[in-house]
Every structure is written in C-alpha cells, then in structure tokens.
Amino acid sequence: MSILILLESPGKISKISSILGKNYVVKASMGHFRDLDPKKMSIDFDNDFEPVYIVTKPDVVKNLKSAMKNIDLVYLAADEDREGEAIAQSLYDVLKPSNYKRLRFNAITKDAIMSAIKNAGDIDKNLVDAQKARRVLDRLFGYLISPILQRQIGGKLSAGRVQSVTVRIIIDKENEIKNFINKNADSSYFKVSGTFNGAKATLHESNDKKPFDLETAYKGKTAQIALINSENPNSKVVNFMKRCLKSQFFIHSVEDKMTTRSPAPPFTTSTLQQEANRKFGMSIDSTMKTAQKLYEGGYITYMRTDSVEISAEGHRDIKKIITDQYGADYYQKNLYKNKAANSQEAHEAIRPTHPELLTLEGEIEDAYQIKLYKLIWQRTIASQMKPAKIKVTIIQISISKYVEDKLNPFYYFQSQIETVVFPGFMKVYVESIDDPDTDNQITKNFTGKIPTVGSKVTMEEIIARQEYMRPPPRYSEASLVKKLEELGIGRPSTYVNTIKTIINREYVKITDVPGIKKDITIYSIKSENKKHIMEVYEDTDTILLGKENKKIVPTNLGITVNDFLMKYFPEFLDYKFTANMETDLDYVSTGTKNWVDIVQDFYDKLKPIVDELSKQKGLSQSSERLLGEDNDGNEITATKTKFGPVVRKKIGDKYVYAKIKDPLTLDTIKLSDAIKLLEYPKNLGQYKGFDVLLQKGDYGFYLSYNKENFSLGEIDDPEDINLDTAIKAIEAKKANNIAEFNLTENGKKIKAIVLNGKYGYYVQVTRNRIKKNYPIPKDLDPNNLTEQQILSIISVKKTYKKSAPKGGSKTIRKPSQTKYSQTKSTKSTKSTKSTNKKFVGKSAKKTTKKTTKK
C-alpha cells in the first residue's frame, strides 16, 4: 500500500521520513498555498460570506498533485491548530484525494507519529470554520476601513481588526506615561537603606501617628522621606541622618516564619516568549522560529499552544528524570488548570519530547536552540517538583535617638533575610521577574549569625537616595504579548504576525527611550573597620527617569490613525469588543456557534458606519492654529499632519516645518516655543557653492552640506558652531573618504564610499536611506579597490551599523563627594557644598555629577 503524508512545513520531512521508512512518501504544502485575492474583497456576500480563494503557490500544488499519482492513501498532516486545520481543508479541496485521513500529532517522535496514524480521523469542520471566520472578519475590517483612512489621512494606510486594537493598547500606555509625568514631574522623596552586620535593611516609618507608643511603633511601611518646600528642601532627610550619627542601633525584634514558593506551570506560547525575552533578550519572532526548529527536530512538543497540561506519557517520563536526578523527595505531580477559553484545541504544554535528553550540546550546533531547549527542559522538570521551603527572618532594628526622644514620625530599620530550607523546584529553575528592583532589599544566602533581641548591631552604611516616582514601563514585545493574553485579544498563532504588521506599517517602532534628566542628591554614612565614623557625605547624581531600552512606542503616524479610528469606529477598537470576538471564534471552534452568524453581526455593525463616512468629505477637521508672526513677518501656524503635530513657517512660496515634541502639544504651544523650534535648520553660510546648514536632531546638532550629513563630534553648544567650525568638520570627514563608487546592485543604483574609520577601513553603502558599513578584508588594499571587489565586500551578510548618533556622543561626568561631619566635642559646625548651600559639617569637597538610568 502506497501512502503519502502531506505536512505543513518542509522542516519536518527528514525527521518523519526517518521514522516511517521507505513505504511512506512525505511532502510539504509550504504553509498556506491558497488565500484570498489581495486585489479584491474576495468574499461572496450572496453566499453567506464564503471566502473566494485563489492558489498562491501553483508550483507547490503541481508538485503535490504529481506526488499523488499511484498513491492509495493520503494523510493530511498539517499542524493541529486552526491554521493547520484550514491547510488540511485546502489540501482536500485542491488536491481532491479519493482516500484520505486527517493526521494529528503534537510531537515528532516515533510514538507520537505511530499513535497519530492509529487514531487518524477526519478534518474538524468547526476548526476550519473558526479560521475561516477570522480570515473573513479581518478582510472585512481591513478592506472596508482602509480606503477611508487613505482618503482622509493620505498614503497607503491600512487598518486591521486586531492590529488596530494593539496599536491602541500601545498608545494608551504612552498616554498613561505622559499623564503620570505631567502629574508627578517633580514628585521626589528620599528612600533610605542600610547594612547592619552584613544584612540589608530598609528604613520603615511607623503607621502610628498618635503620641509615641512602643507597642505599636514598629508596625509600619517602607519610609519615603519627603522633601520640604523651603530654602532647604532636604532638611528633613539631613536631620534624620544627623540623628543616625548620634544613635546606636539595637535589635528590637526577630521573627521567623516559614513560607513556600511554588513552581510555575510549563510553558505556553506566550510564557515561553516572555521568559526567552527576559532571560536571553530574544524577540518573540526569534523565539518562535527557534522553537519551530526544535519541534521539527523532534526535541519539543508543538510550540503554538495555550495549554499548560502535560500528557500521561509526559508525566511518566518527567517523574523518572526527577527521581533519578534529584531523588524521590523532590517529585510532586502538579496539575495545572488552563486559563484560555480555547485551550482544548492544543492538547499539551510546550515540553521536551525526551526529557532524558538533558541538553542539546553535542546534538546540534545552533546556540539559540541549545539555550531555548535548556529553558524548556528546566521549566518542564521544575513544574513537577515540590515547592521550595523558605525561612523568612524579619529583623527590626531600632534607632536609639528615635526611641529615647520618642520622636514622631518614628523611624526604624527592617531587614528581611531569606534562607532556603528545602530548594524543591528551585534546584532546577527560577522564573525571571519583570522588575528586579522589587527583590533588591532582600538578603539571600546570609551566612552571618542572626543577632538576638536587645543586642547591639554594627552599622556599616546608611544611604539616603533621592528618588522620583517612576512612570509605568512601556511594553516590550514580550510584555505586550502578556497584555494581549490578559485582555483575551489574539491567540498564540497570531501574536507574532500582529506585532510584526504594526511595526512594518510604521504605526509603532521598537526603540530606546532616552528618559528625562533629573538631578538627585545622595546622603551616606559609612563605617570603616567597624568604627562609627561621625560623618555624612553628600553626593549629587543625574538619573535618566523613564529610560528604557528596546520598548515599543507609537509613531506620530500611528497616533494619527488611532485618533481617526477612535473617533469614527470606537466600538471596533474597544478591548472588550475584540476580546468577545475572540471568544465567539472559540465557540465556533467547538461547534457552539455558527460562523456565519458571527460574521453577519459584525458586518451589520460595520457597514452602515462605512457607508455614512464614504458619503462625507473632510472628516479630518483642520486643527490648524495661527500662532503669529516672527520678527521678519513670516506667518507661523501649528497644525496636525499624518506624521504628527508640527509648527510651520511660510517663507515665500515654501513652508519650513518642525515637529512639536513633549511636553509641548498642539493645544499648548505658543509663538515663542514655535520660533525656537523653527530656529533650525540655520544657514551658516556657503562653502564651495553649497549652503552649510546647522540641523538639530534627536541626538543633538549636526551639519547638512551638499546632500550629506556631518557629525560635530564633541560640540553640543550651538553658540560654538559657526561657518569655520562647520568647514573643519566637513573637511575632517572628507579626509577619511578614500574613494567613491557609483554602482548597480540588483538593478538599483547605489553609492559606496571607502572610508578610514576608528576601527579600520570599511565600505559604507546607503540603501533606502539606511546606512550600513562593511569591513574591508585585510588582504585587500583600500586605496586600490575595484568595483567588483566592492560588490563582493557588500554582498557579505555580516554587517555592523554605524553607532555614533548625529551630533556626536554625550559626555558622562564622574561623581565625587561632599563630606559633612558631626564632631564629638560640639553639637554642630558649619559646612558648605559647591552650590553654596549650608549644612552641618566640618569640610566640603567639590561636587560633580554622573549620569545613570532609572
């Protein structure tokens, strides 16, 4: 009997062929090979919204039909989710096999494949309908709304049923951050920490605001010593530090309590994406591609799932590994409950297919596959282990001055020491956390002796650091997936494409957020060689409040599109509406609801709005506002474009534009603000017949000259930039230019420049306004390169991007300390810091700043 197995992806062919042997022919459909015609709506409205498909990969279909000749049985073995079921249906519709069965497996192992063959069935029409409904809903939303966007805003704009809501989520977060900063821009306080006998401690303030009562004084929360609105705003914290100078520190109480920490469930798609991002910095796309390879290699189960269940076979294998590797005392069968409504579609969590394979080192060479497999193995094994037992010791430390004088507010230090009594699952794996700062004040693996109540402890240091209220963090790819999952928007198979799409459409971007510079003050007392030094040191520092790396932020275009959609289609961008639609699709997948009814209801709500808007003109009402005129009589206005809010100045027949940036808005900007924004580009004069323009970018000042940009190096003060300094910068860069080539690459004309840089010779090429640098091999002479050699150099995939931003690099200044001391012979003496503020102390040193991020 001749049998043909049709897979979804070619990466599985080799593994499955090796399992089944020569009697089976194994081919792949290369994913979806038919789709809706992109040039048409491709929906039959007279036939219950039935999609009208076209074959998009005719060569694939031709090859599969050829493979079917002389075949007795065809197994449709696409993946076991909605998309896979739709591909299986497409294979049946297009190839029309006379004898077929639907083959489903979630792991590429011999046992899984043979079991799937034994239990082969039919195509699940409910899953097919659920995928069909999603595809039709997405097409209706995109093809009905996108033309309105293009007509009203301009450009090749498009809307997406899930993508547009995802953009809204990101914009809502950005607005939340802006509102927080506007409300709390200057809200700061001092947070005090200390180290006593080697253990970390945090200052606490008593909740008791009544007259001092020793019985209730030590019931409090982490202290935040506020600044005072006066000539000496830090006096409150300074007075606290002075009292610490005069104090001794005693153990008020020691309390032990036992707690347990339970393991996390095995991975779903979204939790794997989040953890790989936190631990390895992997993008969700990279994570899924790596997991796909592991699945195709037979190392893990299917990677698109929102189930946390493990099969009976999996439990059996995991139990053996735990008892063999760690002992029977560590094993505990844990059953986890699925949260997702449609998790019945994916039968198992992501786990190793052969947990006895502890590592892939020596099996494969790909470092990412090795790392990701280890992570999946650890999480899976840990999920079936006993909870960790941890002894938490809470130590309260009294400050003698506050006890003796019965001061209010009453302060004391509290230390938390965690000792692992039984590691349990933590012997294998500990889940990462999004905010490591929450763990910073806990002393772990403490080896010192726990002091007794009433004993005196050695103060090693006390640090009072000014802190600003931190805005909520922006979304990373992983945390956005988590948010989508929490809201019930999208499914495991859609997360990657959703985020990819809104980035490609330039509605959002992944970027580094520079943060807002804030000057802070730090006071410290340090004890050296266990001697109590009666001195308070003052440092100044500069933090970058809200600085974040690789976060998703909306673009001006995304904000403009979102504003339009929120104005005219608010129901369709509502979180609950979109989540309810996902739930309805889940009901379709189980046969509880009919897909046509869901699409009809959606269409009946959307079509009247589209029809009404299509009749109207000028929906995007002009937001232009006349601000006034500059000194030369040029009219200046503030307006909104598809790229965001701008100010513009009319000079003759042309307009000069400048972006309106935070904290300014279209409504709050004034004429004086606009004049400053429009100050650049500034014409410094001409050099060799071309204008030299001073430009101001996101990273500082730079020059534009003869269609090229030039860095100004360390110069960041516009007052220091004139035509002479500009010419020097231009000539300095040109001195490094060895040769220029006008080439043709893939039918397109490009310009290549041979340069001598800081790290050696390289070729710089600009494609689509993006510069890329290619190192020149050492065996080539950079002064005598041919066009063919240049083309060969720039065809190498490995590149490095030019890292220096326009305007040059920023200088980070180093800190020093100002010392204030409390002498033993007198109660107070005078001291000053470099800013001429006076504090108690005996000496002062020059204070400078450093920049850190927060």
Swiss-Prot record:
Q: Which gene encodes it?
A: TOP1P
Q: What is this protein called?
A: DNA topoisomerase 1 type prokaryotic
Annotated Gene3D superfamilies: 3.40.50.140, Topoisomerase I, domain 2 (1.10.460.10), Topoisomerase I, domain 3 (2.70.20.10), Topoisomerase I, domain 4 (1.10.290.10)
Domain named Topo IA-type catalytic is located at 124-610
Molecular function (GO) terms for this protein are: DNA binding; DNA topoisomerase type I (single strand cut, ATP-independent) activity; metal ion binding
- Where does the UniProt entry say this protein principally localizes? virion
User: What does this chain do?
Assistant: Releases the supercoiling and torsional tension of DNA, which is introduced during the DNA replication and transcription, by transiently cleaving and rejoining one strand of the DNA duplex. Introduces a single-strand break via transesterification at a target site in duplex DNA. The scissile phosphodiester is attacked by the catalytic tyrosine of the enzyme, resulting in the formation of a DNA-(5'-phosphotyrosyl)-enzyme intermediate and the expulsion of a 3'-OH DNA strand. The free DNA strand then undergoes passage around the unbroken strand, thus removing DNA supercoils.
Q: What keywords were assigned to this record?
A: DNA-binding, Isomerase, Magnesium, Metal-binding, Topoisomerase, Virion
Q: Which residues cross the membrane?
A: none
Q: Which residues form the active site?
A: Y302
Cite the Toprim domain residue spans from the record.
2-110
| EC number annotated for this UniProt entry | 5.6.2.1
- Where along this sequence does the record place binding of Mg(2+)? E8, D79
Q: Does the keyword Transferase apply?
A: no
Query: What family name appears in the similarity comment?
Result: Belongs to the type IA topoisomerase family.
Q: Which organism is this entry from?
A: Acanthamoeba polyphaga mimivirus
Q: Which PANTHER family match?
A: DNA TOPOISOMERASE, DNA TOPOISOMERASE, TYPE IA, CORE
Give a Pfam family name: Topoisom_bac
- Segments of skewed composition (Low complexity): 814-834
Compartments, as annotated in UniProt: Virion
Gene Ontology annotations for the cellular component aspect, listed alphabetically: virion component
